[in-house]
From Swiss-Prot:
Catalysed reactions listed for this entry: 5-[(5-phospho-1-deoxy-D-ribulos-1-ylimino)methylamino]-1-(5-phospho-beta-D-ribosyl)imidazole-4-carboxamide + L-glutamine = D-erythro-1-(imidazol-4-yl)glycerol 3-phosphate + 5-amino-1-(5-phospho-beta-D-ribosyl)imidazole-4-carboxamide + L-glutamate + H(+); L-glutamine + H2O = L-glutamate + NH4(+)
Pfam family, one: GATase
Top-rank taxon, per record: Bacteria
Coiled-coil residue spans: none
Pathway: Amino-acid biosynthesis; L-histidine biosynthesis; L-histidine from 5-phospho-alpha-D-ribose 1-diphosphate: step 5/9
EC numbers, comma separated: 4.3.2.10, 3.5.1.2
InterPro entries found in the cross-reference section: Class_I_gatase-like, GATASE, Imidazole-glycPsynth_HisH
GO molecular function: glutaminase activity; imidazoleglycerol-phosphate synthase activity; lyase activity
Keyword field: Amino-acid biosynthesis, Cytoplasm, Glutamine amidotransferase, Histidine biosynthesis, Hydrolase, Lyase
Entry's localization field: Cytoplasm
UniProt function note: IGPS catalyzes the conversion of PRFAR and glutamine to IGP, AICAR and glutamate. The HisH subunit catalyzes the hydrolysis of glutamine to glutamate and ammonia as part of the synthesis of IGP and AICAR. The resulting ammonia molecule is channeled to the active site of HisF.
Organism (species): Xanthomonas euvesicatoria pv. vesicatoria (strain 85-10)
Record protein name field: Imidazole glycerol phosphate synthase subunit HisH
Length: 200
């Protein structure tokens, strides 16, 4: 069985992500320091809340540099995905820098509420095994007020007052802006794909 490390970055969704993994038959172990990453074959970085506090917690745990140097597949979920990018406007904080781009505050407009909350459709941008088995017009559940830009690494986007990255992959680094643990079959499929797919 795959050894899955689930990083405790202080996000309230840690337990629900762990439960979602249990439903897939995966008993992930919670990691709170660099030593906990040893032997992991997959690493999951969930998170909700604010980027500055999450980065501060990762620094306190001594996890920033080990995550930057990680040589196994990593997926960030919700705030965890945003932390993979270079910088966040939220608190003007430097993030892990594993993916190019700056996470910016979403702009409210007529009919566009921020935070973006609820179900929204994924817009495939390029092929990736992360999306294998998903139906056309698959939807996922989002809760966020900041968003990463669409880049060459974007696998799927979402439109809420403009396109933003919903699923991302660059080599071993992956991310999902939505909550897989709250996204029914879509979320379960993407988690399973991450756990089972072959990486370059």
């Amino acid at each position: 069985m795959t050894d899955v490390a689930l990083i405790d970055a202080g996000g309230a969704n840690l337990g629900s992500v762990r439960y979602a993994l249990e439903r897939l038959g995966v008993d992930a172990r919670v990691v709170r320091d660099a030593a906990g990453l040893h032997g992991a074959q997959r690493v999951i970085l969930p998170g909700v809340g604010a980027a500055p506090e999450a980065m501060s917690r990762l620094r306190t745990q001594g996890l920033v540099e080990p995550l930057r140097a990680l040589q196994v597949p990593l997926i960030g979920i919700c705030l965890g995905m945003q932390l993979l990018f270079e910088h966040s406007e939220e608190g003007d904080v430097e993030c892990l820098g594993l993916l190019p781009g700056i996470v910016r505050h979403m702009t409210p407009a007529l009919g566009i509420r921020v935070p973006h909350m609820g179900w929204n459709q994924l817009v495939p941008m390029r092929e990736s095994a992360l999306l294998a088995g998903l139906p056309e017009r698959a939807s996922a559940y989002f809760v966020h007020g900041y968003a990463a830009p669409v880049t060459a690494d974007t696998v799927a986007a979402c439109d809420h007052g403009g396109l933003f990255t919903a699923v991302v992959q660059n080599g071993l680094r992956c991310g999902a802006q939505f909550h897989p643990e709250r996204s029914a079959d879509t979320g379960a499929r993407i988690l399973r794909n991450f756990l089972e797919m072959s990486f370059p």
